[in-house]
Amino acid sequence: MTTFPMPDSIINGKATTPAVLPDRNTHQGKEPIPHPPPPEVAKEEMMAAVRTILLNVGEDPDREGLLKTPKRVAEAMQFLTSGYSQSLETLVNGAIFDEGHDEMVLVRDINFFSLCEHHMLPFIGKAHVAYIPNQRVIGLSKLARVVEMYARRLQVQERLTRQVAEAIETVLDPKGVAVVMEATHMCMVMRGVQKPGSWTVTSSMLGVFREDQKTREEFLNLIRHQPNF
């Protein structure tokens, strides 16, 4: 876990400890549940919860159209949160190669979907992922799979963007990583402010992308450019 220096704060006459940044696999510095229930047990419990929701919105869960709804919703939730059962090491699976390449590698327009952790409504968009190798490169499909793994969890877009960047930095130790994500959030479209057409853009720049303006501008220009195919 990474700590960053900050002035001591005084609460009830005592100095607090330095703030701790959450690891990419944790939330607010707390470890995830170490032993989630087996998939079939989790599925049964989710089905019961969905049935309770149906009853409390005024529906009859025993009518024909809703008989299989708890099962369908539980299976959908297991799929949409399948990133919790994946690990970075297993996902990469050794697909790192010493190619001696030291110029930017960019995979853009990676479609993704995730669930907002506040309302459990979808947000959908595109990710643009780039890195400058330190001689080693990773299989291109793995960049998309890293996005997918972290997106298939309950998320906020800001954290998702940072997690993807830090994961690539961890497995490659490159000269720099840049990630930009653009998404529309159903929690802003279907409820609350109800603003269809609004997009949220987040970025995470590490290494030379953060330190060197020309490198950062090259990346931003490349993701603005529309391909001719």
Swiss-Prot record:
A single Gene Ontology CC term: cytoplasm
Keywords from the UniProt entry: GTP-binding, Hydrolase, Metal-binding, Nucleotide-binding, One-carbon metabolism, Zinc
Single GO BP term: tetrahydrofolate biosynthetic process
Pathway entry: Cofactor biosynthesis; 7,8-dihydroneopterin triphosphate biosynthesis; 7,8-dihydroneopterin triphosphate from GTP: step 1/1
EC number(s) given by UniProt: 3.5.4.16
Reaction it catalyzes: GTP + H2O = 7,8-dihydroneopterin 3'-triphosphate + formate + H(+)
Binding site for Zn(2+): 116, 119, 187
Domain of life, per lineage: Bacteria
Comp. bias (Basic and acidic residues): 24-33
Molecular-function GO terms, alphabetical: GTP binding; GTP cyclohydrolase I activity; zinc ion binding
Listed CDD domains: GTP_cyclohydro1
Region of interest called Disordered, as start-end residue ranges on this chain: 1-40
Top EC class for this record: hydrolase
Pfam family, one: GTP_cyclohydroI
Protein family: Belongs to the GTP cyclohydrolase I family.
HAMAP family (alphabetical): FolE
Descriptive protein name: GTP cyclohydrolase 1
